[in-house]
Amino acid sequence: MARRYWDINLEEMMGAGVHFGHGTRKWNPRMAPYISGKRKGIHITNLTRTARPLSEACDLVFDAASRGKHFLIVGTKDKAADSVASAAIRARCHYVNKKWLGGMSTNWSTTETRLHKFRDLRAEQKMGRFKRLPKRDAAMLKRQLSHLQTYLGGIKYMTGLPDIVIIVDHQEEYTAIRECLTLGIPTICLIDTNCDPDLADIPIPANDDAIASIQLILNKLVLAIREGHYSYLGSH
């Protein structure tokens, strides 16, 4: 896999607060190699140890996208949800930004059934069939559709398991990570100083609580995915 230049700038990362970790009492000793020191009771991430895996991750997703592979971006906490949806839409990826439903990937047949139901309800609503139903029945179907939109809206076009999963805050998304490990799906994870880097295929040490930090990391990955997509389209 060829290395490319992704304009990963240490000053830019510092400006976004990528280097700020958690309080020194809330840390995972396995993160020690990525920590450069302490400041006012919090750990500081060594940004050179962030730049390297971020560049590696960009190379990986570019290469995968250039071969037509599919991505899923996961980040369900409030500070990440909007950034995850925005990044996924720009990169034409699938996303989960509300709640990871247990078994979403390991019990794919059930998820697929829910997606078929979701698509059918959307089609019925667009064709105006809800309006021809009794009010009680129409209200029940609208509630079902709203529920499915909330939890499956970001994966409504998925037809199979993703090739790579990008995860924001792997403490929050532990269930998703365990499912990826079970299925052997490669993961790229933002890992803060309280995380276990060994659970990710490519751990990117970064502040996973600051919106600016999350957006910076996702923006780099999105750029690489988009360039990979263009390369794929240009060769087909």
Swiss-Prot record:
Keywords of the record: Chloroplast, Plastid, Ribonucleoprotein, Ribosomal protein
Classification via Pfam families: Ribosomal_S2
SUPFAM superfamilies assigned: Ribosomal protein S2 (SSF52313)
Subcellular location: Plastid, Chloroplast
Membrane spanning residue stretches: none
One GO MF term attached to the UniProt entry: structural constituent of ribosome
Xref: InterPro entries: Ribosomal_uS2, Ribosomal_uS2_bac/mit/plastid, Ribosomal_uS2_CS, Ribosomal_uS2_flav_dom_sf
Biological process per Gene Ontology, one example term: translation
Protein's UniProt keywords contain Plastid: yes
Keyword Iron: no
GO (cellular component) term, any one: mitochondrial small ribosomal subunit
Family to which this protein belongs: Belongs to the universal ribosomal protein uS2 family.
Name of this chain's protein: Small ribosomal subunit protein uS2c
Originating organism: Amborella trichopoda
Gene assigned in the entry: rps2
